[in-house]
Swiss-Prot record:
Protein name, per record: WD repeat-containing protein 48 homolog
InterPro entries tied to this protein: G-protein_beta_WD-40_rep (IPR020472), WD40/YVTN_repeat-like_dom_sf (IPR015943), WD40_repeat_CS (IPR019775), WD40_repeat_dom_sf (IPR036322), WD40_rpt (IPR001680), WDR48 (IPR051246), WDR48/Bun107 (IPR021772)
Family assignment from sequence similarity: Belongs to the WD repeat WDR48 family.
Keywords: Repeat, Ubl conjugation pathway, WD repeat
Entry GO MF terms: ubiquitin binding
Domain of life, per lineage: Eukaryota
Name of the encoding gene: wdr-48
Length: 691
């Protein structure tokens, strides 16, 4: 097993990331794009943009409340119960397959990895291995149950095949590279015996290849945009494709041609499912409608229901005579809709009869390739909606949690204000790694204005909220930029002028439990300047996910902050932690303060006949009162300079920048950022105070 990717020092520089979140995250926080159902144990596996795979215990269709009886959400008395989470991915979970006779779950992610999980009923340690062969987003997976092979495809243009039977703890790679593929791969399908696979990459080509020989015997054209989903029937003679061009196409593999096209959807079709007999296809996508069409006549369709958000993933509860369908969308809720509801436009008795199609299905009408502005759904669907009531209530719903979708970093470069999909505003402390205040439903801009201060601290971290949670990233270029005094940082310290470094403190917090860091901290003397600069660090919550990654974001190792002291995690960290981290936490090395050049001139109101322009240089954290003291003593040559306390120097000298009077406690970088506002060197004007 491998817990980390290749830790080679070559390539782009490494970064550190951590996620501020609750200890338990039982609900999805954004889009749900991957679904798998274990019918034997009535378990649903769900994954999406928040990086976490969740397991749910769900009732059989006959045990669920009907749509007529109302929606049942996950909760204490709900038939749907959260079971556990599988947490190792660091980016969007794109796909999942159940394999190994239901004992294994294989998942793919935008973090470039394929991960293997043991999901046996009583196994509490689900993670088995990380397969790190891809170098870009892993877009999709396919499973050949008769051959017990898993296939992965990626934006890196590679396709890999893994042997599930080889060993649960050590998947064997059968095909290293699909030669000749020149573009990212968006979709993938295989026959149950892996006799051949279909895949799509740009240039509107669906291509076939034989995984056993790596031969590519055919190409099929027809779609005018990316193909987002592919399905093959069991004998490999027919295929279905769904595209961003809004069409569903049926292909004859032997003839290598498109033999039927469905145009019911007005916008991109992102996901399709087909029953075991390859008789009916279920489709969903950007227009939010979920439709059912007979495969032998894609010109006919039936509207099943309309979702609240674009549909990312469909999953039939059963392949044989499906009674319900699971739906994941751009929202965090997951729903199961009945396919036998009294409110649904049912097929009636004879599903194969022509009369049932003409009675319960509508026929697609030709449409232009570019729909008229303002049309958000096909006109024929709108008319069908008017004629027949849509099913508007799912039989089950697993409610999601709100996701952070907006944020603002406060001027102190320590706190971040966030707003979520329900307009709740909250305040996070980056140094403490936790949420510190909730403001309820308010406008983010209004709270930001209330919390903003006239202080400038250089940026030292990057914020990302694509997972619906707050992710903080540190890199070598900026992490040590934020020097400030303990007074400005708000720390209770006897020496208010002691300098602290936020980035150094953050590294102490992240590695506090790592043995090399603990040893270095213990050996450093209290008078050590770096020790002083980082001594105010916070102890982070132990459940905080912590990731070492390459410069492009590809993960090298993921762990929890609280596990850094464990033997395995400690050893893996030692292999992948970059030098700029170890220099600080092991050797107590920090960059020096940044210097700032500036000019001193007498204020124009002094009517100086030949004003002298002095060019000076000082740390950017130098306070204006120190400049006042220099002017009073050195420039003006006052003999009583030593008798004027520093906290009273403003009674002798005034300082100006761009005609604005400066406060004595303001530092030079704040003056440059808020008052000077130019790229050139800072100009400061002094004027003696007249008694």
């Amino acid at each position: 097993m491998s817990g980390a990717s290749n830790t080679s020092q070559s390539g782009s520089k490494k970064k550190l990331s951590f996620i501020i979140r609750d200890e338990q995250e039982p609900l999805h926080r954004s889009a749900v794009s991957a679904l798998q159902y274990d019918a034997l144990h009535s378990r649903l596996f769900t994954g999406g943009s928040d990086t976490i795979i969740r397991t749910w215990s769900v009732p059989q269709h006959k045990d669920a409340f009907s749509a007529r009886g109302g929606v049942r959400s996950a909760g204490k008395n709900s038939p749907v119960q959260y079971q556990s989470s599988l947490e190792r991915h660091t980016d969007w979970v794109t796909d999942m397959v159940l394999c190994g006779n239901g004992k294994l779950l294989v998942s793919s992610s935008n973090d470039t990895t394929v991960k293997v999980w043991s999901i046996e009923r009583d196994n509490k340690h689900g993670y088995l291995d990380s397969l790190n062969l891809h170098t870009d987003y892993v877009s999709c997976l396919a499973y050949a149950p008769l051959a017990e092979k898993v296939v992965s495809a990626s934006f890196d243009r590679n396709i890999f095949v893994y042997d599930v039977n080889s060993n649960f703890n050590n998947f064997r790679v059968l095909v290293n590279n699909l030669l000749g593929c020149k573009n990212s791969i968006y979709s993938l399908a295989t026959t149950p015996n892996l006799s051949h696979c279909l895949f799509f990459s740009p240039h509107q080509q669906i291509r076939m290849f034989d995984p056993r020989t790596n031969d590519k015997p055919m190409k099929m054209r027809g779609h005018s945009d990316n193909v987002r989903a592919l399905l093959l029937n069991d004998d490999g003679t027919r295929a279905l494709s769904a595209g961003s061009d809004g069409t569903i196409r049926l292909w004859d593999i032997g003839m290598q041609k498109n033999i039927a096209t469905g145009i019911a959807h007005e916008e991109g079709v992102w996901t399709i499912q087909v029953d075991a007999s390859f008789k009916f296809v279920y489709s969903g996508g950007r227009d939010r409608y979920v439709l059912k069409s007979p495969v032998n006549d894609l010109s006919k369709f039936q509207v099943l229901f309309k979702e609240e958000a674009p549909v990312k993933k469909l999953l039939l509860s059963e392949k044989e005579n499906p009674s319900s369908i699971w739906v994941g969308t751009w929202k965090s809720d997951i729903k199961r809709w009945s396919l036998n509801s009294a409110n649904q436009n049912s097929n009636g008795g004879d599903e194969e009869g022509v009369s049932s199609f003409s009675t319960y299905y509508t026929t697609c009408k030709p449409r232009s390739s570019s729909p008229p502005p303002g049309i958000t759904a096909p006109k024929h669907i709108q008319r069908l909606t008017d004629a027949r009531e849509l099913q508007n209530t799912p039989e089950l719903m697993i409610s999601g949690a709100p996701a952070i979708n907006k944020y603002k970093i406060l001027n102190d470069k320590r706190h971040v204000l966030t707003s979520d999909t329900e307009d709740n505003v909250a305040l996070y402390d980056v140094l403490a790694g936790k949420k510190v205040k909730e403001y309820g439903k308010r406008a983010l801009e209004n709270v930001f204005e209330e919390k903003s201060k006239t202080v400038y601290v250089p940026s030292w971290f990057i914020v990302d909220s694509k997972s619906g949670m707050l992710q903080i990233t540190l890199d070598e270029l900026d992490v040590f930029s934020s020097w400030l005094t303990t007074k400005d940082a708000g720390f209770d310290d006897s020496d208010k002028e002691t300098k602290v470094n936020y980035g150094g403190m953050m590294l102490r917090s992240l590695f506090e439990r790592w043995p090399p860091c603990k040893l270095a901290t213990a050996e450093a003397g209290e008078s050590d300047e770096v020790q002083k600069a980082t001594s105010h660090y916070y102890t982070l919550p132990e459940h905080t996910p912590f990731i070492v990654c390459e410069g492009n974001g590809r993960p090298l190792f993921r762990l929890l902050v609280g596990d850094a002291g464990n033997e395995f995690e400690s050893g893996e960290l030692a292999q992948c932690v970059p030098p700029w981290v170890t220099d600080m936490i092991e050797r107590n090395v920090l960059p020096k303060f940044n210097k700032m050049p500036f000019y001193l001139l007498p204020h124009p109101s002094t009517n100086s006949k030949q004003p002298k322009k002095d060019r000076l240089s000082a740390t950017e954290m130098l306070l204006v009162k120190k400049v006042m003291e220099h002017v009073y003593e050195k420039v003006l040559g006052n003999v009583d300079a030593n008798t004027v306390p520093l906290n009273q120097i403003h009674t002798k000298i005034e300082m100006y920048c761009n005609d604005q009077k400066l406060e004595p406690e303001t530092d030079l970088r704040t003056v440059k950022h808020f008052y000077w506002k130019q790229s050139g060197e800072l100009l400061l004007y002094y004027r003696p105070v007249k008694n």
